[in-house]
A protein has these predicted regions:
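Cap/lid segment of the alpha/beta-hydrolase catalytic domain
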Residues: 1-40
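Conserved acidic catalytic loop of the alpha/beta-hydrolase fold
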Residues: 32, 42-58
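Gly/Ala-rich beta-loop-alpha elbow adjacent to hydrolase catalytic centers
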Residues: 63-72
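Hydrolase active-site cap/lid region
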Residues: 73-118, 174
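Active-site nucleophile elbow and catalytic-triad environment of alpha/beta-hydrolase enzymes
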Residues: 118-135
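Short beta-strand/loop motif that positions the catalytic acidic residue
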Residues: 138-139, 144-147, 151
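Conserved alpha/beta-hydrolase "acid-adjacent" motif
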Residues: 152-158, 184
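Histidine-bearing beta->alpha loop at or near hydrolase active sites
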Residues: 174-188
Length: 203
């Protein structure tokens, strides 16, 4: 298979020189900046899709883990050229996740208090980058979700909410483990292949 590995904005070589860790810049400049960053990520991927389409690539799919899963879910909402989408341990409400993380949640709550912003308003401010805000652009039988039963970083409720939003899409696979330790990874990789074979994405 031909695989395109995408480096998201503010990750790896794309991070700022003063960034304390990869991905820091994604969250560190406020809600509007997070929206712009996600829009940038989706734009980058779609530019690559345009290029691959021009080369004559017959079909494309997307998968990603963690923030990559979040991005994969949003891409499935905006680009119907995808043959399949398989978000892995995705989040669906970035605001709720930020509020649960420490110390990010502490800083976010201080900012919200100073700005007199409620949690509802904060959620609405980043709703544009959530897959829950859109109907999927591809058929539900071409969507698959993977989640860790013990994930505390991207809690299972996020995957379940997305599954319901996607009208209980094609497949939902739970694995033993958490966000970092994927026990039985071989099983969900086989499940992914079975799913892709079922929709005729792979022979």
């Amino acid at each position: 298979y031909d695989i395109l590995l995408v480096t998201l904005p503010f990750h790896g070589r794309r991070q700022e020189r003063t960034s304390p860790f990869s991905g820091h810049g994604w969250f560190s400049h406020g809600f509007c900046h997070m929206n712009e960053t996600m829009g940038h990520a989706i734009h980058d991927i779609r530019v690559f899709m345009d290029y691959l389409e021009d080369l004559g690539v017959p079909q494309m799919g997307v998968t990603g883990i963690s923030l990559g899963g979040y991005t994969s879910a949003l891409l499935a909402a905006v680009d119907g050229r995808l043959r399949c989408a398989i978000p892995n341990v995705p989040v669906v409400s970035i605001m709720d996740i930020v509020l649960e993380w420490f110390p990010a949640g502490w800083f976010a709550r201080i900012g919200m208090k100073l700005g007199d912003i409620s949690v509802t308003e904060a959620r609405a401010s980043v709703a544009i980058q959530s897959a829950l805000s859109f109907k999927p652009a591809i058929a539900k039988d071409r969507l698959m979700l993977i989640a860790g039963a013990g994930d505390r970083f991207a809690p299972p409720k996020h995957t379940h909410i997305l599954w319901e939003h996607w009208q209980r899409c094609g497949r939902l696979h739970w694995f033993l483990g958490n966000h970092l330790i994927h026990l039985d990874k071989g099983r969900y990789l086989r499940a992914m292949r079975s799913f892709m074979k079922h929709i005729k994405f792979v022979p």
